[in-house]
Amino acid sequence: MANWNENQDLIHGDNLLLYLTSGKTVVAYATNCSLQIDAESIDTSSKFSCRFNSNMGGKIGYTISCDSLYTANEDGISFDDLMAMMVSGEQTEWYMGQESAWTGTCETNPHTLDTTKTYFNGKAVVTSCSLEAGNNDIASCSITLTGAGEVQKNGSTIG
């Protein structure tokens, strides 16, 4: 019989972070991050398919998006860093996973990737950067990265 314990089984969204570059540097002041994986389908319908469409799996692609507060802090990846990555057009390493446990104060937390837990990684190119500054609001920014190659789980091929 399955044992379910939501206090142990579920991953709190605050602990799932996006890290970029080979140094696994966290995106500073991130408020949201997501990984979207999509597979194309190839139409294989023929007269042998009767009245139903037939498909087989095609290429797989993915995007990573992240929203964060705009900051001048240089300890994490900032909007300025992301803009420079986009202009360079070079691929960057990315990692999405839980941060390591930290017993110090919130202000001194280095937000390092916990490689003992499940994480996803790969290479991607920054394809979109936007900066938003509303009245009586903290300025925020959004980025999108488009995958270059495979998504890996814990540094290994999936499947």
Regions found by a protein language model. Name each.
Residues 148-152:
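Hydrophobic lipid-interacting interfaces of membrane-associated proteins
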